[in-house]
Each structure stands twice: as C-alpha cells, then as structure tokens.
Amino acid sequence: MPSIVSSLLLVVLLTSPLGAIPVLYPSPPPLPAYPSPGVRILRPPESLVAPLGDEVVLECETSLPPERFEWSYRRWTPNGTAVNGSPGAGFKYLKTSSMKANVTQEAAISRLKVLVRQDTLGEYRCNGWFGPLLVTSTTARLELATTSVKSQEPVTSLQWQITNGNSVLWPCGQPVRSNPAASWTFYRNGVELGPEYSGTGGNLFLRNVSVDSSGSYSCQATNPASGERIKSTSSMELQVVPSRGSQVKAPYLLPGQPGSQTVTAIEGGTLLLLCPGVGSPPPTAVWSSPDIVGAVNNKRTRVLAHALEISNVQIGDSGTYICYLDNGVRPPLEHFIQVKVEQPPQIVRPPWIDMVNEGERVQLECEATGVPTPEIYWLLNGKSSIYDTEAEQLPNGHLVLHSVLKRHAGYVQCFARNSLGEHSAGMSLQVTPKPIHSESTQQSDHNHSKANRGRRPAQMIPPSAPNVTRLSDESVMLRWMVPRNDGLAILFFKVQYRTVGEGKRKNWQTTNENIPYGRPEWNSEMGKSFTASVTDLKPQRTYRFRIMAVYTNNDNKESNMSAKFFLQPGAALDPMPVPEMLEIDEYSETAVVLHWRLDSDADEQLITGYYAYYRPSSSAGEYFKATIEGASSRSFTIGNLEAGTVYEFKLQSFSAESASEFSALKQGRTQRPMVSTTEEATLQTGVRDTTTPSHNETFSMSPIVTGTIGGGAVLILFVVTTCLCMWRRRNSRAHRGGGQNKPRMAELREDFVPLDSCSPTKQRQRSRHIHITLNPLAQQQQQALDEKNDAEHDMTYFQRQPTYDYDPGLRRMSSSSLRRSQRTLERAGSSNGNNNNLNQSADMGPVDNPGKPGRVLMKRPRLSSRSENLSSGSLNSVGV
C-alpha cells in the first residue's frame, strides 16, 4: 500500500503544471514565549525556487492590519550576505506597481508579485508600519531552478556479478546537481522501475536480488520546479547467479560502492543509513554507535535489510554509526557512517527591556541555537544596526547602545540566521526624553527687576513626553513624569492630541479635564509620575499626544510629543493576562498594600506593568489611578488616602499596545486614627464599658510614657482648678465685706424673714421653694411695693441662708406644682383668696397696716442667665 501511494504522488507531481516550488525547509519548533508588543509577523514570506520567466507570489501576514506594507530587496550573493558582510544590510525598498514587482494589500495580508529574472533573484523582506513601529519579517529567498551534471564526472559503466539473496546499493545520482532536489526515476533494460526501489539522493536499492534482477540499469533526474529532465552519466550492468553451497566468501564492497560515508540530516526529518556490501552467503547487518547510548534500540529507529531508518531526527542523533556485515566468514565488513544533524536557528533568549531614559547606556541580549551556529544581526526600526553610530554588536551577538537617543524609540529586532533559514524576536523600545529646562518667558516690571537684580529667574520644568497604552478601541492611557527640580510649582495638567498621517496637518485638541498636580511631594527617585486617560478616539488612526503643564505664574509649557501611536482594534489583539487581587493590607492611616497574582499559564513577558484604580466605596465618582512599573511586581503601596476609610480597588495589566480586562473589585480600608491612652473610658449608667479596641487602632506611645503624661496633665488641672476656686472665694468675701459698708434695706430684707414666719405652723410652708413666672407688666408695681417695704423697718428679723434658683427646675416644673405654690402663697399672705397679689408683689413681709393681717416678706433672688428670655416677656423666679 505505501508503494502505491508513493507512485501516485510521483505521477501527480510529474504530470502537474510546472511552476515555482517552495524550498522545503523543516518547520521550526514552536516559538518560545517572548515579549510581544501585540504587533508581529504571523506568516513571513517563504523561500521559492522558480524557472526564468515565471511569476511568483510572496505572501506576508501580520497580527494586525498595519497602516501600510513595504517590501525590501537585496540581490542574491553566493554566501547569502551583502558586500559589507552583514546579513541584515544592503536591502532597498521596492517601488510598487513596477514591471518587476507589484504589491497588493488586503487587510493584514500583503502580496508581492515578482517576475523571475536574473535581476530579481535575491532576498525579500516584508515590512509593516504600525504608527512609529516598523516590524520586519525574516528573509525569503527567490532562487532559480537549475539542473546540471558535474562537469568533471566521467562516464562510468559498472559491471557487477553477485549471488542471489544479496542486497545491492547503486549510487546513480552522484554526478547530478539540482535545485530544488531532483526526483529520480530508475530503469532496467529501458523499463521504468517502481518507486519502491528508490533510495535517498539518487541511490538505487535492490533488496534480496534474484536471477530475474539481472539487466542494464540507468537513472534520470527531474527538476520539480522547471520540469527539466537530465539523464545521469552513470550506468550499471548487473548479473545475478545462483549461489552454490561450496562457494563461500566474506562480505565485500562492489566497485563504485561507498565505504565511509558522511550523511547530513535536518532536525525533525527522516534519515536512512545504508550499509552496502555483498557476500556468500548473503551477510546480515548489525548496527551500533560508540557515541550515542541507545542509538538503535529506541522507538524512533527501525532496522531494515542493509539499512537503519531514524525518524524525527534530533540533534542528539549526531555522531558515528557503525554497520557490521557478517555472514560467518571472517573478516566481517565494517562501515563507518558520520551523521550530522542540522538545526534551523531558534532564538531562545530574546531581547527585553522595559523603558530607558535618553542618554543611558543599554545592552540588549539575544541568544540563539542552531546548527550550523547561527549568525546574529539587529534591526532598529527596520534599519541595520551597523549604520547606527551609537550601536555596537559584541562578539557574542549582544547589542550595546552607548547613548540611547530618541531615534532609537521603536521596534528593535534580533535575527538569527544560518543556511537553513532565519528566526527573529522583537520588542518595543520606549525612550523617555530628557527634560528641557527653559526659563520663564514672563518678565517682571522695571522696578521689580531692580529689586530682584542678581536673582536667578524661576524656571518652568516641563513634564516628560507621555507613553501611550491602548485601553480600548476608543481610549488610551497616558503616563508621564515630572523630574525632580527646584522650578516653579505646577498647578495642573492638560492633555492635547491630534491625528497624523491624514494629509493636511491637524490642529491640537485639548481635553476638558484638569489633572491636578496633587501634593508637592516626589514619589520616586526620578520625580513624580502621573497617569490620565483620553477617550472618544477613533480606531485605525494614528495619534500624537503631549502634556501641557500650568504653573503658579499662570504660564504654561508643553512636553515633547509622544511617538506616533496607532490605535488598533481590540478584536485583533491577543488578550493580556488579567491579574487576580488576593488581599489588601492596612499599612497605615493613609496607605494600604495591594497583593495580586497571575495565573500559572499567564505569560508574564507580555506585561509592561499594571494600572491600579481606586476610590472610596461610598463614592460613585471617577477612579484615582496609579501606575505600577514592572511585570514581576506582585504588591504595591497606595498612599495619600483618608484615615479609617473603606476603598474599592481593581487592577489591570498593560503593555505598550494594549491593556487587560479589569480584575474583580476588592475592598480594603486604611487604619483608623490613633486613640490616645489618656482618654478616660466612657461609662454609661449601670453599664461598664468592656469594648475591645479594634486592631485598626494604633498607639504610638508606650503605656509608661502615656500614663506619665496623662497623670501630669490631671495634676496640673487639679492645681489650676484649686487656685481658681480660692481666687473666686477671696473675691466673694471681699465683695460681701464691701457691701456691709453700704447697707440697703431691700438687700437686707432679701436675706431676712420675719419671726412670725418661723412659727411651727409655717415651717412646712417655708420649706417649699417655688418658681413662678410673673407678668412682666407688673414690674412697675413691684418697684413701688419694694419702696414701701423699705420704709417699714420697725419689725424684728432673723437671718437665714439665702435660697438660690436652680435653673433646670424651670424645665421640670409642671402646671400642677405651680397651682399648689400659688395656693400656699395665698394662705401665707392672707390675701383673702385672691392670688392676684402675685402679680403685684413678689417680696412680702409683715407690715403695720391697720385692718390687715401681717404680711409675709418673701425672698426674690436674682435671675440667672438661663432663665432670661424664655418667653416673649421677661421671666423672674420667686422663692417661697
């Protein structure tokens, strides 16, 4: 069955229309994970071999539709290098729609049609422009299909006679050269043989020959690209005779058969090792290898008659193989076969760097494997590094930029190249420009300049050029920094942007948002960093951004422009790893610490950093933003928060071209304000405070120090209070002593009561203390009554303790107690049941008035401040 399938394939190949044949290099192993900025070559052009006059198509596909495609070309040289020796130099851009080449673009695919001529043979590259980034593919070779016979090879005709049962190996195709590798057809007596007789490289292999195998053998090579056929100059006459038991012969080689061999294989392919030789009786082959352990007895090898087949060839299969042909007759025949396994180049350590500052020295590393050893070269935004005066390639392939300049910003690629092809890896290099220190253009008036003559004028230090990251199809995130400086303070920032590459130059557009500078503190060694988002953009367009800083002198200064940024649609972007928020630690009253992780299968090298968003959980306003540089970060401290406040946080990872989805929201809180240890516990009535302090409360002082300070404060408070009390008592005594020198009857009567009011029957009445609100309109009558009572001084009095008002009693007095007090006052004053006397006088005493009983003199204490203005009129208190 395999022989039938092989025959059908050969027939289809030979009868199909002839054209360009791709060079069948083995597929390289899967690419290792390396930092991809989101734009790359998905399918580079393939090398082709075609005859003159044919039209071939080179096809290139990128991960995203670029702004435009360009193709570059270099003439083919025998060793595949340019004149100056660099494999990455000497390429020139092709003019589109020319007679030699025609370029078409369809979304993310570009096709180059080339007419095969002597001046179009060479190497081609596909270049895709993504804003300021130029991504270059690996090279594709366009070679001419050729078939020829080695001119120095003589015509050979072999005569072989062997016994039946042997196996014969005839190297017919050695004199023929073909590009691409020729397909072989073998003939016996002019009749074509089946493909089951074919070996590798034009070798005819006849197994277990018989008398019927005798005949004249020849071969013919066919170029699969051009269809050209050429007959080999070698022929062989084979005569097979029956074996005789009496004739024995040790294994030997026939004339023209190779002895020692060197075989080259490509990693991943299939290798067939042949062991020629005949004998009588027919010998048996035994395989071994002094260099490779288990070279024969494994799942990838199969022992055939006079051959060893190795599938899925690996680099470890390189070495020496020995074939012993033994038929029992000494000596056995030994074959030494040297196997070399070639490997396409593969970059195992790609270049990677996050961000560099202008003027810094940077070394980019690139390591690759391959056999033969690959040669390393570098492209800086599509241009060979040998043309850059600041670039130097070290012998180990690493690239050194002695002083990074703004022109180095873009796409940096490392290429590894050997005879089997090329492999590349790239990264987006971001350069932070140096801050431009410019003096303020505003000038003071003449007098002010005289007063400040000799002083250095204040400077306006502009922010750095912003770095741009895609957030969505319509928004981006900007990151910039203000370097440490002693210049004018910044009040706020404005973001400006404009589209580029659309014909007429567009004006700058300014966003409405004022981005506050915040606290005048530097949050890093470099200065202070800021972030802001810009929305309402349009995808598939290229933008430039800049930051406008407004200073305290009401002047402004803009930053340098950002690099061109092409806003790509998110549907074509690979998703970024989404961080998972683990926990939020309470760091202090104004700071928390975020902890997160990535999934185990997440590619960390795709990440440039993280964005942290936060806001108070009670707020529905905009999120505050913080930038976390570095893909390996797993925690971050966020400060300048409110004490004892619950915040909600979310994260997203970002790269130069895109950002991930948001992580799940998670809440955390800052520590509560510190509580002093001198604060006394608050006790509720009948309840003892047993509250345990929260773990958020922080005591900044030790208990001994705090207790000492608290005790001292209490002692000082006690001494001050005692002094104030003594001072007030002394003033009170002095006031009373001074008042004795100026006695007044009204004041004396306020402090005395008549003797008849001290009778036992009156004791109960005197014990009451009643507060009555008087009519303010009766104050004039009260004054007249007081003057009358002052004249009646012939009664006997005794002194008693004064009764003072208690202001809260006004709140507790009910209407019922007021009525009882009025009735008591009527009985005491013998007012004939008329309590209207209350509205006439509040201070009473016995008076010598004929026809009237003795009057009761009552004390009217002075009003306290709290009893004033409780109603629309003046309020007085009367004590009975």
Curated annotation (Swiss-Prot):
Chain ranges of the Fibronectin type-III domain: 462-570, 578-673
Disulphides: 60-126, 172-219, 275-323, 366-414
Keywords: Disulfide bond, Glycoprotein, Heparin-binding, Immunoglobulin domain, Membrane, Proteoglycan, Repeat, Signal, Transmembrane, Transmembrane helix
Positions with biased composition (Polar residues): 668-699
Residues carrying sugar: 79, 102, 208, 447, 467, 560, 696
The Ig-like C2-type domain, residue ranges: 37-142, 154-235, 251-339, 345-432
Subcellular location per the Swiss-Prot or TrEMBL entry: Membrane
Domain remark from Swiss-Prot or TrEMBL: The first fibronectin type-III domain mediates a specific interaction with Hh protein, in vitro. The second fibronectin type-III domain is additionally required for in vivo signaling activity.
Assembly mode: Homodimer. Heterotetramer; 2 iHog chains bind 2 hh chains when facilitated by heparin, heparin is required to promote high-affinity interactions between hh and iHog.
Listed name of the protein: Interference hedgehog
